[in-house]
Every structure is written in C-alpha cells, then in structure tokens.
Amino acid sequence: MQTNGLHHVTVVTHDIQRFYNFYNKVLGLKLLKETENIENTAMKNLYFGDNEGNAGTLLSVIEVANPLFVKYTTDEIYAYSLRVPTDYSLYVFKLRFDEMNIKYDTVIKLNGKHALPFYDCDGRCVYLISDEHNKGIPLGEPDDDSNVDAIHQILGLGPVLINASNRLLTSSILTQVLDLKHTSSYQLAAFDNDVQVFTSGDGGSGGEIHVVQGAASEKKRAANIEQVGVSVTEEVLFDYKKRLESVNIPHSEISDRKFYKTIFFKDPCGIVFELSTKPDFNL
C-alpha cells in the first residue's frame, strides 16, 4: 500500500463570496465546482484547483454561519502552501499583493525552497512556495481563463504544516499508518523546535507534510484549516480502512463526496486526515 501525495486541503469561511473573490480574483485559482455543504445543505462548498481538477491541486472551502475567532494553538493544521512555478513567480505575486494591498511577509525557506508568506481574506497565513528546484510530484495544468499568466499560476498544493503537542504521535500516524517517509528536517523562525518533513508518493513539495511541536500563540485568526487529504487509489482506500480498524483508530465509513470517495479519521492529537480517491469534477 502507498499514498500518492497530497489530495486536498479543506478550510472554512463565514464569507464565501469574499473567499471566492480573494482566491479567484487575487490568487487566480480556478473555481471547479460550487455545491452544497454535505453536513449543512444551506451552506455552500466551493472547490478550487488546476484546469483539470487534479488531485494535489484542490482547495475545498466550506461555508459556516458564524466567524470562528480562535487562537493559533497546538494540535492543528498551522498552515498550507500553494505551489508556483519559479522563484520569479513569487516576485510577480509580491507585486500583485502590493497593488491589491494584501499583507505579506518577507520570503523565507520551507525545506530549502523559497516561500512567500501572505495572509488571506480570513487572516490565515498561507505560503506561496517556488517549484523552481523541486523534484517529484509535478505541477498541475494552467487555466487559460485565469487572470494570472500561465507561467506564474498557482498549480498545486505544497507542504502542509502541522503544529502538534506530541510530535511523535502524529509522526507515527504518518509513517506507520499512512506509509509516509521521514526525509528531512529544517528550522522555521516561528518555532523553537525543528520541523520534521514526511513525504508521500513521488515526493517533493506536492507530497510533503511538515510536523513541528510548538507552543500556542496569543494571535487570533478568523477561521481554521479543517483537514488535509492524501491521495490513494480506490482499491487501496479499502485496504487503509482495514488498517485503521486493525490498529483501533476510529474513522468514518467510506463516503462519496460527490466528486471522490473518502475516509477520514483523527490522529491522537486531533488532527483530521482524509484518504481520498481520484476526483472527477465533470459530474
């Protein structure tokens, strides 16, 4: 069995139109599908991704009734990143952010790759990460209708950063249950401890989950990151269900999320993971 890199990230927002305006008009992401929230059909669920709606490029946003004012804390998905083709693409987006008064910080490195931290419409810290020196899982397909030039478009998910109160517990889930490999570590200024890098599938930025054991922050934000999805084949999805049962990890049943099948579970620290199959947004 093996996982095949990142599949999607799910976030929540209380202002779905503002979210759409930011991610489509500012970042240039393609809206793949607008549908209803399965848990609350009065609320919307939007899917963004590359031109083909490929796994590894998907951002799912769920509308909620009220804004969530919570602190950055441990046992959460701290941030996610979005892949752009080159280092110069980061500069292009920096100019774009200046024009649109979008807050951003100085360029840093995530596992050796240049990344530009910025703050989205809900106050989340998101990283644009350069694919210039990346190897492994390839970028997705550009969208001809995007308002960002094809050579600079966001074409995939990059590393997802998890802040865990017990790094060993979350790490063991990644390696022993989901078959990721520990490949490296690096320093990130926001944390005292090293960030540990775990890799899925063919690796590279599109297959990385980064785990750090850090302290809670007093900084508040307006919405959170719900879960991270990892890609699997449909056959392997059933095998992972059996594995979760064998190690007594509570999990959902395999469910049909309209565009792909999925099973989700929480690790001992409360981080929500999904195992998801190849998407089809032509339904």
Task: Outline where the language-model segments fall.
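Core segments of cupin and vicinal oxygen chelate
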Residues: 12-55, 107-119, 162-206
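Short, conserved charged micro-motifs
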Residues: 88-92, 168-171, 235-240
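Conserved donor-binding loop and adjoining core beta-sheet/short helix segment
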Residues: 33-36, 48-82
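Vicinal oxygen chelate
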Residues: 35, 45, 91-156, 184-210, ...
